[in-house]
Regions:
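A glycine-rich, hydrophobic/aromatic-adjacent loop/helix-cap motif
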Residues: 2-172
């Protein structure tokens, strides 16, 4: 989602004051998570915050339970990024981990280039907030700005065009 966008990570990185004023993240690689699908889901929370009134990115595991829509070749593309402990704490807050909107889950990500395997933390929307009856004020689609940020990062990191057009773009 938006965490693969350098501008988004830089925005949060600037909030961290360190004596050496170092960068708090490094993109190590681009990879994919097999047997998962990228989706936008409305985050069903009662809020006046307009940024939470549109759908947000998450990933879902392909299982035999969702066989009718399941794709054996499903994969989610993303960046493999090393972040400082300070930036990680800010990301946890940003992702609503402490409010149970998302949960951090360790997954094995495969490099697109070297096929090296990385253990990485992904953020997955919790069922508590994803599988609720729709609240009429929440859009089932991402905001133009949010989607654009994700699509621009995907283009920058050269994700497959078919993947971008199929999963990341909802606003044609």
């Amino acid at each position: 989602g938006s965490n693969m966008c350098n501008n988004e990570l830089s925005k949060y990185s600037k909030k961290i004051i360190t004596p050496d004023n170092r960068n708090h993240f490094t993109v190590l690689d681009v990879g994919y998570l097999p047997k998962h699908t990228f989706v936008y889901y409305p985050l069903y929370v009662k809020t006046n915050n307009p940024t939470l009134k549109t759908a947000k990115a998450t990933i879902i595991k392909e299982t035999s339970a969702n066989k009718s829509t399941s794709n054996a070749n499903a994969k989610v593309y993303g960046t493999i990024t090393e972040v400082s402990p300070e930036l990680y704490q800010l990301i946890l807050t940003k992702e609503g981990i402490y409010k149970n909107y998302y949960k951090p889950v360790v997954k094995v990500i495969t490099s697109l280039v070297s096929k090296e395997k990385y253990k990485a933390i992904t953020f997955v929307m919790t069922n508590k907030y994803k599988n609720k009856l729709p609240i009429s004020s929440i859009s089932p689609y991402p905001s133009e700005l949010y989607e654009s940020m994700i699509v621009k990062a995907a283009v920058h990191y050269q994700f497959p065009k078919k993947y971008i057009n199929t999963y990341l773009k909802t606003l044609k």
